[in-house]
């Protein structure tokens, strides 16, 4: 069976997050990688993990969100695949914080393929390897096909909300995508905007910085803000 057919079989009959998870699991099996995730990106910031092959993949994606750098973000901004065979290679030191953090997690290779939906680059398929190896040509072609298929579960979730969100960056449509694992971060960012009288971009940076400084996930910090267990002040 051709790789494309195997990818289609993996998502057959599935929808939304379930389809995204199955697609990521198939990528791990078919492309000789150790983890895979599909990220949703809006306004230049990694805003959610749509699907993953498991908890390690979600952790790798969460790091991009906390640190504000990584293959997914670069893939979307450049509208092209990002292929880093070995994060330990000094010539590949494009992410001064994310790279060393991933090496600490025993990940050497990272590869990202942009996901295009309705003419907009709104996410990426991320692949991770413990050992530094170039993607074989047929695996690279398969990853491109998988990124194209990733648009299907995205369309399931975004549906009419996607058009509202693209039409108005301030729309509540993005907050309404509650099936994403990090909806709390968007809501907490809005609370910080109201509390501190700052711009959304600055509010997100403060939330990320607090998460990184305290060794917690951005999602956990967001939940504390929403539950009023944490209030970030001017000094954060």
Regions of interest found by a model, annotated:
Residues 140-152:
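Allosteric cytosolic regulatory segments
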Residues 87, 124-133, 138, 155:
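Short beta-strand-to-loop transition segments that serve as allosteric relay/switch motifs
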Residues 159-236:
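Signal-transducing coiled-coil/dimerization helices and immediately adjacent hinge/linker segments
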Residues 1-67, 223-236:
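Intrinsically disordered, low-complexity terminal regulatory regions
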Residues 35, 99, 112, 124:
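Short hydrophobic/aromatic beta-strand element in the GNAT-like acyltransferase core
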Residues 109-116:
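Short hydrophobic beta-strand micro-motif common in sensory/regulatory domains
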Residues 41, 57-94, 100-108:
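Regulatory sensory and allosteric helical modules in signal-transduction proteins
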